[in-house]
Regions:
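A charged, aromatic-enriched C-terminal amphipathic alpha-helix characteristic of glycosyltransferases
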Residues: 10, 299-330
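Membrane-proximal helix-turn-helix segments that form the acceptor-binding/catalytic region
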Residues: 83-116
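Short alpha-helical donor nucleotide-sugar binding micro-motif in glycosyltransferases
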Residues: 110, 229-234
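A conserved mid-protein helix/loop that constitutes part of the nucleotide-sugar donor-binding site
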Residues: 169-185, 199-202
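Aromatic "clamp/platform" in nucleotide-sugar-dependent glycosyltransferases that forms part
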Residues: 242
Length: 333
């Protein structure tokens, strides 16, 4: 076996079939010895690290992001290796503000790893700043099999003339409250539809009622069919996050042919270029102006240049990962 690929979900394993077609033998679940252990997400770092120690093989980590509110100015807990297992001694003070054990173990593994890869320039810089590790930028992908293009999913008749869609976890940094405040500013407020699950759901419902904004928020993860239907019916997709390591939702929206308005943060600029409208992530008046501009345009779907999405497909991601994987396996590039 070439690679033992550690992934917490289907998304983080998207490039595996293409890499197998390229000749790599990859296992998603196995204790058999492999030439390389690869953690495709922070949730798998400890398991991949300990596997690499047991089987004495190289280790590669994919670090998606390092949220500033979780690490802040704090210091990592002390992490030790005992018999190939990571053990942690918590600091009594000045530690990382949130999930100290998780990020302390990740830092230790990154400093021991043979390679650390990140999806964006922003994350590369954060890894060097917080972990003291030189990482390589290797962008991941959106699910180009699931969102193959607008021509595969023709637009449905909208249930109301103006509808605004947002798709993500319902947590504070995703910034959905800004959407509601912006919608309340419009002379003809749209239906706001938010698909996702998380602790902010009830707060958003209360805010929408206070602002008299029509909100459709099921509060549970939607099926693929429901998400495709929501994209087809929406007038615009809004991605208001204050922080991202990569940013999947706007890529999905562009692939589905939707107008997209995104927060002006570095990863959005890095991958979306001039294909979307931007707004300051704490300025609801700015977002309201961008919404008015989109709603004033004809309803036809915008054309997205293939040059923007093609480098971020599953196959393109596999092509980027392959040289690094083969190098760590000791093969000629």
């Amino acid at each position: 076996m070439d690679v033992r690929w550690f992934s917490p979900n289907r998304y983080c394993a998207l490039p595996v079939p293409a890499l197998r077609r390229a000749g790599l033998e990859i296992a998603l679940e196995s204790e058999q010895s492999a030439g390389l252990a690869f953690a495709a997400d922070g949730a798998c770092v400890a398991a991949a690290f300990e596997y690499s120690r047991r089987h004495r093989c190289p280790l590669a980590l994919y670090v998606w992001d390092l949220p500033p509110w979780r690490l802040g100015p704090g210091k990592p807990d002390r992490v030790f290796e005992v018999g190939g297992t990571l053990l942690r001694l918590p600091r009594l003070r000045d530690r990382y503000p949130e999930r100290a054990g998780y990020y302390s173990r990740m830092r230790h593994a990154a400093r021991c790893a043979d390679a650390v890869w990140c999806p964006s320039t922003n994350t590369v810089e954060d890894v060097e700043r917080h972990f003291g590790v030189r990482a390589e930028r290797i962008p991941f992908c959106y699910d180009s099999d699931r969102f193959p293009g607008a021509e595969q999913f023709p637009r449905s008749a909208p249930r109301c003339p103006l509808s605004l869609l947002s798709v993500s976890r319902l947590v504070p940094h995703k910034n959905h409250a800004l959407i509601l405040r912006a919608a309340a500013r419009l002379s003809a407020p749209p239906l706001v539809r938010i698909l996702g699950e998380g602790p902010e759901a009830e707060n958003l419902r209360v805010l929408a009622a206070t602002l008299s904004v029509r909100l459709e928020l099921p509060g549970v993860w939607a099926s693929d069919e429901a998400i495709h239907a929501a994209y087809r019916e929406a007038s615009v997709l809004v991605c208001p996050s204050r922080f991202e390591g990569f940013g999947l939702t706007p890529l999905e929206g562009l692939a589905m042919g939707l107008p997209v308005i995104a927060s002006d943060i570095p990863p959005h600029r890095e991958f979306l270029g001039e294909a979307v409208r931007y707004f300051a992530p704490d300025d609801d008046a700015n977002l309201a102006r961008e919404l008015e501009a989109v709603f004033a345009q004809p309803s036809g779907r915008p054309a997205v240049l293939p040059s923007l999405l093609a480098p971020l497909t599953i196959s393109a991601c596999a092509d980027r990962l392959l040289p690094g994987l083969t190098r760590l396996l000791g093969r000629a590039p």
